[in-house]
C-alpha cells in the first residue's frame, strides 16, 4: 500500500512537470489566446447604428474613442450624452452578458457601425477630430488547438497508466483480453452417453478404459500402470469426434471442459500461451475431468515450417501446451482429448508417448453404422413405419453421421411444409437429393434440349449397366438440381480396395454421356454438359497412372505423397519426376481417356435401339428408378454378371528348381 501511494505521488509530480513544461513551451500561444479573448469580448457591440448616424455623432463631439475590428470593416465606439438632447439620444444604461460568462457593467453599451468598403478617409476624419482609435487584428482561434493537442498528450498518458498498468487498478486490460476472448466451456454434465453415439463401435471400445480410469483410477495405479494423458481423435468432418468426447465425460460423470484451437491465437504476443495456462489451471481445479481441444491443428502444426523458420505466436502456444502436458502428475485425473481432421500437419512432439499417447481414427460409417446412426437420429421423429432405414442407408454411401442427421432434419422440414403428419420415404429421398445436388430447378420445356439431356443421362446409365465392373444404377432423372440439367445416380461400392477393372469401368461410364451425344447427334451437336465429366475423368486417369501404377508406362507410382501444405516447405520441394517422364505421363493419360471414350461409343452403337427407347421413355416420365432401368435393359440384352475374385494359376516351369535344403 505504501509503495502504491509513493508511486501515485511520483505520478502526480511527473504529470505536473509535464504540464508545466508544455505550458512554458507554448506560452506565446497562451498570450495570443488571451488577447484574442479580450478582442472577442469588445468586438460584440450591443447596438448597431448606420454610418450616417456615426458621422453625425462624430461631428457633434459625442464620441470619445473608436476601436476598429475586422480590417476596419467594423467600428465600435463609446458615446456619451450630448448637451443637445434633440440631436442625440442617450445610450441606455444596461447590464450585459459577455461572450464567456456573467459580466455586470455600469458603463454604456458599446455602439457598432459597419464601415463602407474601401473607406480610406475614416482614419483621416478621426485624426481631424482628435479621436483616439485603435485597430485590432481579426480574432483568430487557431492558436488554441495546438495548446489543446499538446495538453492532451500528458493527460492521455496519465489516464492510460491509471487504467491499464497501475497495480490495484479495477480494470486489467491485458488480463481481460486474455480471458474474455477465450471461450472456455465448462459442463458439469454433458448429458451424452455412449448409447447416443452410433456407427463408430471400434472407437467406443477404445474409450471404455478411459471411463474406467476416471471412475476407478486405483485399479490402474495399484498395478503400476500410468493412465493415458491424452488421445487425438482423427476423422473426417461430421463423424462424431466431439460427440464421442462428450460421451466419455458423460459415462464417467466428470466435468467436460472444451475450447477451440483457434481461441488461443491472437495478434498479441504471449496471449495464446497465457490462455493455455488458464485452461490447464481450470482443468486442475475441476479434476478429474475431460479437457477437450477441438481443431487442435490450428495451434499444433509442425514448428519451423514458415518462411525462414521463424518463431511465431502459434509456436509459443504449442510449446506451452507441451510443457503443461509434461507437468501432469500420474494421479491428476485429467485426460486431454483433441480432435482434428488434419493429423498429418501436427507436430511430432505433440504425438509422442507421454503427451498424446494414442491416436484413434474415426472413419465414415459403413452401411451397418449408418443404420445405427439413423436409429439414433430418428428417435424423436415421426417416421412412417413402412420406411426402411436399411434402404436409406444403402442410398447414402459415404455419408457421415452429421450428413445423416441433416437428411432426417431436412425430411422433417419438407414434411411440415407439406402439412403431413409422418415422414415418408419420398421426403427422405428428396432430402438426400437436395443435400447432394442442390435445390430442385424448373423442368426443361424445350423438346430439343430435353432430348439432348435425356440421351446424355441415359448414355451414362446404359454404359454403366452394360459394364460388369461398374456400380449399379440407382436413379436417372431429368429434374434439374443445382447447375445440372439432369442427373444419373449410382450406388458406389464401399469396398476400400478398387481394382483396375473397376476404375476403368468408372472412367468409361463417366464418358458415356458425351459418347451418347456423339453417337446420336454427331460431333457438331455435342454439348458443354460433359465439362464436369471430363474433370472427373482426368483426375481418375491421373491417379491410375501416377499413384496406383495401373498403366503400361510403369507399375510404380510416379507421384510422391504430398507434404504438408506449408509455404516454407513448398518452395523447397523438388518435382516428383523429370520433365520427360511428365510428358509421358500426360500422353498415357490422354491414351487412357481416348481408349475409354472409344469403348463407350462402341458399347452405345451396339445398343442403339435400346438407347433410343430409354431416352424416349425418360423424356416422357422424366425419372426412371434403378431397378426399373435394369429390368428394361434385361428385356433386350443380357446383364453382365458381377465379377468374382479369381486366382491366376502359376505357369508351369519346365526347368524345375530344387528347393534349398
From Swiss-Prot:
PANTHER family: ATP-DEPENDENT ZINC METALLOPROTEASE FTSH 2, CHLOROPLASTIC (PTHR23076:SF139), METALLOPROTEASE M41 FTSH (PTHR23076). Zn(2+) binds at residues 456, 460, 533. Coiled coil: none annotated. Its cofactor is Zn(2+). ATP binds at residues 235-242. SMART domains: AAA (SM00382). It comes from the Eukaryota. GO terms for molecular function: ATP binding; ATP hydrolysis activity; ATP-dependent peptidase activity; metalloendopeptidase activity; zinc ion binding. The chain crosses the membrane at residues 8-28, 141-161. Residues 29-140 are lumenal. It comes from Ectocarpus siliculosus (Brown alga). This is ATP-dependent zinc metalloprotease FtsH. Acts as a processive, ATP-dependent zinc metallopeptidase. Homohexamer. It is found in: Plastid, Chloroplast thylakoid membrane. The active site is at residue 457. GO terms for biological process: protein catabolic process; proteolysis. Its EC number is 3.4.24.-. One of its GO terms (cellular component) is chloroplast thylakoid membrane. Keywords: ATP-binding, Chloroplast, Hydrolase, Membrane, Metal-binding, Metalloprotease, Nucleotide-binding, Plastid, Protease, Thylakoid, Transmembrane, Transmembrane helix, Zinc. In the central section; belongs to the AAA ATPase family. In the C-terminal section; belongs to the peptidase M41 family. It is a multi-pass membrane protein. It is an enzyme of class 3 (hydrolase). Binds 1 zinc ion per subunit.
Amino acid at each position: 500500500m505504501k509503495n502504491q501511494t509513493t508511486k501515485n505521488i511520483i505520478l502526480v509530480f511527473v504529470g505536473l512537470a509535464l504540464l508545466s513544461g508544455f505550458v512554458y513551451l507554448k506560452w506565446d500561444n497562451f498570450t495570443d489566446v488571451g488577447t484574442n479573448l479580450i478582442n472577442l469580448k469588445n468586438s460584440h457591440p450591443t447596438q448597431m447604428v448606420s454610418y450616417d448616424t456615426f458621422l453625425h455623432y462624430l461631428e457633434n463631439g459625442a464620441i470619445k474613442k473608436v476601436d476598429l475590428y475586422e480590417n476596419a470593416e467594423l467600428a465600435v465606439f463609446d458615446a456619451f450624452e450630448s448637451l443637445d438632447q434633440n440631436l442625440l439620444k442617450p445610450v441606455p444604461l444596461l447590464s450585459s452578458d459577455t461572450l464567456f460568462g456573467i459580466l455586470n457593467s455600469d458603463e454604456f453599451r458599446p455602439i457598432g457601425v459597419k464601415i463602407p468598403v474601401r473607406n480610406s478617409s475614416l482614419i483621416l476624419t478621426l485624426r481631424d477630430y482628435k479621436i483616439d482609435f485603435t485597430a485590432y487584428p481579426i480574432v483568430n482561434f487557431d492558436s488554441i488547438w495546438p495548446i489543446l493537442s499538446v495538453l492532451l498528450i500528458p493527460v492521455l498518458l496519465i489516464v492510460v497508466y491509471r487504467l491499464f498498468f497501475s497495480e490495484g487498478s479495477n480494470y486489467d486490460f491485458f488480463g481481460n483480453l486474455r480471458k474474455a476472448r477465450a471461450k472456455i466451456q465448462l459442463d458439469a454434465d454433458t448429458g451424452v452417453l455412449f448409447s447416443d453415439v452410433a456407427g463408430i463401435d471400434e472407437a467406443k471400445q477404445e474409450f471404455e478404459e478411459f471411463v474406467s480410469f476416471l471412475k476407478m483410477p486405483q485399479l490402474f495405479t495399484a498395478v503400476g500402470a500410468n493412465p493415458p494423458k491424452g488421445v487425438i481423435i482423427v476423422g473426417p468432418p461430421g463423424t462424431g469426434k466431439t460427440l464421442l468426447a462428450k460421451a466419455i465425460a458423460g459415462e464417467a460423470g466428470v466435468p467436460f471442459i472444451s475450447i477451440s484451437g483457434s481461441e488461443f491465437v491472437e495478434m498479441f504476443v504471449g496471449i495464446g500461451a497465457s490462455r493455455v495456462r488458464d485452461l490447464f489451471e481450470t482443468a486442475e481445479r475441476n479434476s478429474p475431468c475431460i479437457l477437450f481441444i477441438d481443431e487442435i491443428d490450428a495451434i499444433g502444426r509442425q514448428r519451423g515450417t514458415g518462411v525462414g523458420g521463424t518463431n511465431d505466436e502459434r509456436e509459443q502456444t504449442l510449446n506451452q501446451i507441451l510443457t503443461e502436458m509434461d507437468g501432469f502428475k500420474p494421479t491428476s485425473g485429467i485426460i486431454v482429448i483433441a480432435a482434428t481432421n488434419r493429423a498429418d500437419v501436427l507436430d511430432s512432439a505433440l504425438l509422442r508417448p507421454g503427451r498424446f499417447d494414442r491416436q484413434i481414427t474415426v472413419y465414415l460409417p459403413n452401411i451397418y453404422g449408418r443404420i445405427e446412426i439413423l436409429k439414433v437420429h430418428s428417435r424423436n421423429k415421426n417416421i412412417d413405419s413402412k420406411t426402411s432405414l436399411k434402404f436409406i442407408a444403402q442410398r447414402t454411401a459415404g455419408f457421415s453421421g452429421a450428413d445423416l442427421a441433416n437428411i432426417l432434419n431436412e425430411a422433417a422440414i419438407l414434411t411440415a411444409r407439406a402439412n403431413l403428419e409422418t415422414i415418408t420415404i419420398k421426403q427422405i429421398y428428396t432430402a438426400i437429393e437436395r443435400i447432394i445436388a442442390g435445390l430442385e430447378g424448373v423442368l426443361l420445356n424445350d423438346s430439343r434440349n430435353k432430348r439432348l439431356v435425356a440421351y446424355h443421362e441415359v448414355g451414362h446409365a446404359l454404359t454403366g449397366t452394360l459394364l460388369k465392373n461398374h456400380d449399379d444404377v440407382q436413379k436417372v432423372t431429368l429434374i434439374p438440381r443445382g447447375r445440372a440439367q439432369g442427373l444419373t445416380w449410382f450406388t458406389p461400392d464401399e469396398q476400400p480396395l478398387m481394382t483396375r477393372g473397376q476404375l476403368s469401368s468408372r472412367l468409361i461410364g463417366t464418358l458415356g454421356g458425351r459418347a451418347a451425344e456423339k453417337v446420336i447427334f454427331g460431333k457438331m451437336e455435342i454439348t458443354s454438359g460433359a465439362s464436369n465429366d471430363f474433370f472427373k475423368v482426368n483426375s481418375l486417369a491421373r491417379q491410375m497412372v501416377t499413384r496406383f501404377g495401373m498403366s503400361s508406362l510403369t507399375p510404380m507410382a510416379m507421384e510422391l505423397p504430398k507434404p504438408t501444405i506449408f509455404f516454407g516447405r513448398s518452395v523447397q520441394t523438388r518435382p516428383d519426376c523429370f520433365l520427360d517422364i511428365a510428358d509421358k505421363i500426360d500422353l498415357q493419360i490422354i491414351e487412357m481417356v481416348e481408349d475409354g471414350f472409344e469403348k463407350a461409343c462402341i458399347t452405345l452403337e451396339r445398343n442403339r435401339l435400346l438407347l433410343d427407347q430409354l431416352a424416349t421413355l425418360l423424356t416422357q416420365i422424366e425419372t426412371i428408378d434403378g431397378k426399373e432401368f435394369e429390368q428394361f435393359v434385361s428385356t433386350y440384352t443380357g446383364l453382365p454378371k458381377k465379377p468374382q475374385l479369381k486366382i491366376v494359376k502359376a505357369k508351369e516351369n519346365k526347368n524345375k528348381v530344387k528347393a534349398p535344403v
